[in-house]
């Protein structure tokens, strides 16, 4: 998506930072960044996230009222990540290590919005073939959102390019 944005919409700010392991710090940093832009998030911001990033996108949308797209979003990350306390590697670069602390579990619990809101401003792309997360939980959590339920695929959404058009369409993005 970053390549498409750079090539077709360089007029739009594309921000895809490496987030810190602390969920509270990650969300606070993202909120600070958005506040620094001086925009109306409900009108001028869209957030896209996958897996834990989908959880963060849901948190940001609940706080800012912006449009958002989630791809195989983590629904209960506090529960699901509890077994990963300790040293981990990043998905993007297995040579990069970080430490996931037990203290991050209550941070995730505190961040979880009670409901997905604004649900009508959400697109959820959910793969039934997700090998890490239960697609039925995702489907139930994002009830009322625009949902694209995929037969097969996987957690990483390896066929992402096939769905880019749906994401761009939902966000009303066309080539400039």
Regions found by a protein language model. Name each.
Residues 23-25, 55-57, 77-79:
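Short active-site-adjacent helix-start/loop capping segments
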Residues 48-57, 61:
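Gly/Ala-rich beta-loop-alpha elbow adjacent to hydrolase catalytic centers
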Residues 3, 7, 59-63, 140-143, ...:
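Short, well-ordered alpha-helices that flank and scaffold nucleotide-derived cofactor binding pockets
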Residues 11, 42-44, 65, 119-121:
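A general structural motif
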Residues 67-176:
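The alpha/beta-hydrolase serine catalytic core
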Residues 44-49, 69:
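Short beta-strand immediately N-terminal to the catalytic nucleophile in serine-hydrolase-like folds
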Residues 1-41:
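Active-site catalytic motif of lipid deacylating hydrolases and related acyltransferases
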Residues 18, 51, 128:
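Nucleotide-sugar donor-binding loop of glycosyltransferases
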């Amino acid at each position: 998506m970053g390549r498409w944005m750079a090539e077709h919409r360089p007029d739009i700010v594309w921000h895809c930072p490496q987030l810190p392991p602390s969920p509270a710090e990650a969300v606070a940093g993202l909120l600070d960044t958005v506040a620094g832009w001086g925009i109306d998030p409900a009108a001028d911001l869209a957030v896209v996230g996958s897996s834990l990033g989908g959880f963060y996108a849901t948190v940001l949308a609940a706080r800012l009222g912006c449009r958002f797209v989630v791809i195989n979003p983590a629904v209960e990350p506090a529960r699901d990540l509890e077994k990963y306390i300790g040293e981990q590697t990043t998905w993007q670069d297995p040579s990069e290590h970080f430490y996931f602390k037990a203290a991050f579990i209550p941070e995730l619990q505190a961040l979880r919005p009670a409901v997905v809101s604004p649900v009508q401003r959400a697109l959820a792309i959910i793969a039934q073939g997700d090998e890490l997360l239960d697609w039925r939980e995702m489907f139930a959590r994002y009830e009322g959102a625009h949902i694209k339920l995929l037969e097969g695929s996987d957690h990483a959404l390896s066929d992402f390019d096939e769905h880019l058009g749906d994401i761009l369409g939902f966000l009303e993005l066309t080539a400039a």
